[in-house]
Amino acid sequence: MDKMNPPALGQASALFPDLEPPGGVGKATVLLGGSTGLTSSDMEFQKMLIDERMRCENHKTNYQTLKVEHTRLQDQYTRAQNELKRLLSDRQVTQEKQQLLLAELRGELLDKTRDLEELKLQVLTPQRLELLRAQVQQELEAPIRERFNKLQEEAENYRSEYNKLRYDLTFLKSEFDHQKEEHARVLEERRIRHEADVARLEHDKEDLATQLQSGDPARDGKRVEALLREKAQLHQRLRGLEAEVTELRAERNNSGAQAENVQRIQIRQLAESQAAVKALEAEKQSIRMQLDRTESELRLSQEQNTLLTGKLHKAEREINSLNSQVEEMKHTHKLELSNVKLECVRSKGELERERDMLQCQVEGLQSDIEVMKSALERNKELISEKEREMVRRVQAAREEEIHKMATLQEEKLELENRLSELEQQKALQEVTGNSQKEEWEERLRAAQLGEESVRKELQNLRTKVQQQGQQLEELETLKAENADLRQQIAELNLQVGTLSHSESELLDTNNRLRESLERVREDLRSARTQMERTQQEAERLVEERRVEWLEEKHKLQDIEAELREKYSQAKERLQRAAFAQKKRKTMTELKENKLKDKIQLLEAKIAELEIEAKHAQLSKRLRELQRRHNEFRRLLLGNQMTSSTPLAQSLLIPNESIFSNIQVSEEQHQRELCVLRRRLEELENSQQQQLEELAAPLDRDRERLSSPRDALPDLS
């Protein structure tokens, strides 16, 4: 009950006036005055609420109108943006078309300039003709000069090799003659020596035979000593002869190796000369092929000249067609440029009109925004004043409630004091009290509902204030968008300026293209005249070149004939060298046969010397036996003179047998010596016959070799 509202207490006091004591009339009047004050404040509060609701409705209507205006402005802005995008896309398309046209025209201009450069390059100027002539002459003369130099170098090499071979041949011939003379001298000396040795041996043999027949022991001893000395000398001579035989064998081997080396060298030289001859023939064929090639190239160059003249006429026709196309393109380009200019002017006027409209709209929006800002400021001031008034009223209501609570507590104390008095009346007043209580509760509920409605209205006001803040933010975004639109308008103005600049550049490029076309026409006229002159000069040069080629052909044929003569001469020389090589080979074979015969003779002499040595040994043994026999006989004769006859007879019998054996061996030795002499005579006769047979062809070869040697020219 202590939380009961003051209006309810006022109503309770108004409903129960008879409950107050007689002394509490002033207090009741006070309470009634407070209740009337409370009702007037409620009325004011309700009026304020109604005013606030009206203002809120006004704000709502203003907000709705602002929202509709904002949507309309947004639609206009989107339309303006779409229109700007469309204009930008159209402008971009037109720019792309113009750039494509410009690129195509530039490409065509570049192609035509390239064709003109190619035609200029194809046009034969006198300088280019001179360069071509020099280049062709270098290309044709360079391989021929290289081959001619190579042929000269090879001829020099062959000449030097031929001189070397000639010098080697003369040196070998002189060496061969010297060796032949030396060999003949050595053979003659050895033959004389062997004849002297044979005569001396025969004389010694006769002396030995006489000594054996005479039988003088002292003289035999001396002769044995002399024979021993002779034997030692013969051994030394035998060793010397063996050394000479080994030297002769080594010389034979060396001469065979030298002959083989010379033969191999000559075979290699023959092969090299044959290869050189083949190379010369191949080069001759290559020169012929090159001549054919040069003639075919000359024909091809003439055909190419005719083709170039045809291409030149075709290029002139194409240039005329291209000039007509360029004129057509110029005309179409002018029409397109005029259309583009008209479209640019039209789009420029539309853009200016739209810009003015947008500026008007932006100014209207700015004025609306300023009005709305001032209205918002006023609304903010009114809301702040109302909030301050509401705060003051709430504080006053709270103070009144506190005061009323204090008075209620006092009344409560008084009522508690009176409760005891009122308990008796309670039963009577329960029905009326319950009804009053319900009424009071209903009033309390109504007051609570009013308080809640006030709170809701405060919340609604706060939400409205927040919405107004959002609207202010949206207005700021609109300001930013308007600034963006202004920037876009400035960019569009810049693009319009660039379009006008590009239009002026296109006009300049068209003028330059016209000038370049005029220059190209003049160049074509000059090129045509120059082509005619160069064609005449080319025909004249072709005739001169044909004459030069014929002269060079005759020169090459003369060179070929000279090379053939040189080749035939070299071939004859090589044949003569091969014939001389064959002769040298036969001579070396004859030398080998002679050396073999000499070796056989030496081997026979060595065998004879061995037999003589054996004979000397046997004679030595015989003399030794004779000496011993004589000593034994002297001993026997000195000691037993009486009985010497039978012993002497017995001793003489073996002596006779010994002498018979010696005679048999001596006869055998004589037979062997006769056989050896016969063999030696046969060998000498065969050698003499071979020498006589070889002498005649050698003399003929010498005469032949001397005659070509005198006839051969010195190539150095």
Curated annotation (Swiss-Prot):
GO biological process terms on file: cilium assembly
InterPro entries associated with the record: Centro_Cilium_Assembly
Keywords: Cilium biogenesis/degradation, Coiled coil, Cytoplasm, Cytoskeleton
Disruption phenotype: Reduction of olfactory cilia formation.
Cellular localization per UniProt: Cytoplasm, Cytoskeleton, Microtubule organizing center, Centrosome, Centriole
One GO cellular component term: centriole
Annotated region described as Disordered, given as residue ranges: 1-20, 691-716
Domain of life per record: Eukaryota
Ranges in a coiled coil: 55-638
Bias (Basic and acidic residues) ranges: 698-707
UniProt family annotation: Belongs to the CEP83 family.
Function: Component of the distal appendage region of the centriole involved in the initiation of primary cilium assembly.
Protein name in UniProt: Centrosomal protein of 83 kDa
Annotated organism of origin: Danio rerio
Phylogenetic placement of the source organism: Eukaryota, Metazoa, Chordata, Craniata, Vertebrata
